[in-house]
Amino acid sequence: MIQRFRFGLPLPTDSVVQEIPVSAGPVPFLTAEEDGWAYRMAPDAIVYGLGEMPRGINKRGWHYVTNNTDEARHSEDKLSYYGAHNFLLIDGGAGRECFGVFIDFPGKVRYDIGYTEYDALRFATEEPDHELYIITGDDLNDISRQFRQLIGRSYIPPKWAFGLAQSRFGYKTAEDVREVARQYKENDLPLDMICMDIDYMQDYADFTVNKQRFPDLADLSAELKAQGSRLVPIIDAGVRIDPKNPVCAEGLANGSFCTKADGTPFVAAVWPGKAYFPDFLRPEVREWFGRQYKALTDCGIEGFWNDMNEPALFYSPERLKAFFESMDELSRKDNIVQDEFFGKVVGGALGLMNAPADYASFYHDVDGQRVRHDRVHNLYGGNMTRAAGEAFARLRPGRRTLLYSRSSFIGSHRYGGIWLGDNASTWAQLLANIQMMPNVQLCGFLYTGADLCGFSYDTTPDLALRWLEFGLFTPLMRNHATDGSRMQEYYRFADMLPALRKMLRLRYALLPYLYSTFMKAALENTSYFRPLGFDFPADPDAREVQDQLLLGEGVMVAPVYTQNASGRHVYLPEAMKLYRIRSVDDYDTELLPAGHHYVRCALDEVLLFIRPGHAVPVARPASCTAQLDETSLTLWACPDENGSARCRMYTDDGETSDFAAPEHWKVLELN
């Protein structure tokens, strides 16, 4: 059951698609406080949700703020990342209630989940006007399913988007891109996408191409597609200020940009320098901006990634001027003391980026109402995704277009996926990736993944392999790095190359199961990844597991995420069949009873556990998704006590939007 409660006159967010009448009665489970809401937690209560946030699967023990932020340093002390996902799913503990809470609010929401008082959960919206949805059901899976129905079907990408994406900030020429494709082919590594960062643009301006470095983008796109790969370019939120640029000129002429208090366009700097920012909260601006993608779809481009759309702000001219004046004053002093150096020099420079005062200095038009940006800040990136998603439905009707974004809000999951932002090449970030996935998908973002190997810092060969051994299970599987870091395309690691090749081929072999699991989750509002406690709520050990995930109906994964480890502890809430896999053709199996186990897992091995009565269809590996043959399959299985195992498999053309036809489903059974 879903109950809706309205307080004041909340601003629209378009997060919800299901019409729920407003309830007049008291809000169940929660206690109203002066500045928000509270819930008393039992000692064994668990709090899931909040999507893209730091720390573990259980969010208890920290405080958080949903405030979409260009956060380059991912660590446990952070309060916010790139997405605002205001859904909590509370497992009250033994003998207590389970319920979901969705806070539909476009600005900051502050959460204290056992941080101040370990038994107290509190949350408060920055303004009093908001809506609450309280969801109750039979169990955690049922509540999750109801929430997904409330917010609408998750975005479904083309099937080729489940292949490997190779990306880097630093592919500076068309020849760089060709060399990546050539090396993947020569090293017999499967590949489906090469993602281009802002290097391909002219002066870092959206919807432009540098003709000297990329003389014929359409030809490059066609050349790669003939080899089984797609080009996937980046688009940023800020529009470079250049009167000669048609996008800038059009946007100014039709009043498409966010404005300052005096009605003039708001200006801040990002990669191209000074930029304007489209007012994506207006339907006509979304339609206008979405049309601009045609310049690239006409070149044969079938996939995009949207970035810098929190929006990230490097500086505003006003704030930069004030900083320079402050530095000029300091430069005339003979001695700069500690407080001045760290406060004015270091703090002043760092304070230029994403300054709260800048976010409070420009405005949107929301249904004819002038609204200051910081009040609706979390809607911005999601509405850029919406602009693109709606445009692709017009530009490529009946066809699927790949789209994923950095910033998001619940609701934008209907238009595109997300990646988990600018992580780092550390083992801690691998664990963070594992722990973030179920909560992000709980909030509707099914097409999700992290930058494999890590985006910043220099990766190591063993981290590249171990991260791939988890990444081969995630819907978005992209290797991405920043300019200046170690080159980390998989063919670069000569000593690990045989193992990396086998793991990439394993991903493609498992696509019949992974794609079917994704489509089931999208079409039936079930989960792709979920914590063990969802299926085993009465098992206290299962509820506390933070580093194993259930994958669809029949599989559990337990990645190794510590350096130099040759195995790991695994908890099995029921008997399962272990597949210790070195390649599609080289693995050993063992039926393990329920309980605690130490399981050996060499650096070139991955652990896959199949639940009783379930089967996993396995294809022969392929060089790209287009070459995958799903007509001849092997079943990896864990037969039940009757000796049978089954799976539901989904097959379609992977390109069109005809999702619901019943003939796409078939049951494979082993007796």
What kind of region is each of these model predictions?
Residues 33, 41-43, 91, 102-105, ...:
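Glycine-rich, histidine-containing beta strand-loop boundary motifs that form or position
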Residues 64-65, 81-84, 178, 286, ...:
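Short, hydrophobic/amphipathic alpha-helical packing segments
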Residues 77-78, 154-157, 167-215, 219-221:
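A conserved hydrophobic secondary-structure block that centers on an alpha-helix together
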Residues 75, 379, 383-401, 407-418, ...:
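Catalytic core of carbohydrate-active enzymes
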Residues 1-161, 168-169, 174, 181-186, ...:
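Catalytic and substrate-binding clefts that recognize carbohydrates or anionic sugar/phosphate headgroups
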Residues 82-86, 96-98, 106, 129, ...:
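Extracellular structured ligand-interaction cores
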Residues 190-500, 536:
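Aromatic- and carboxylate-enriched substrate-binding clefts and catalytic-loop regions
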Residues 87, 143, 147, 184, ...:
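A residue-level signal for conserved active-site and pocket-lining positions in enzyme catalytic cores
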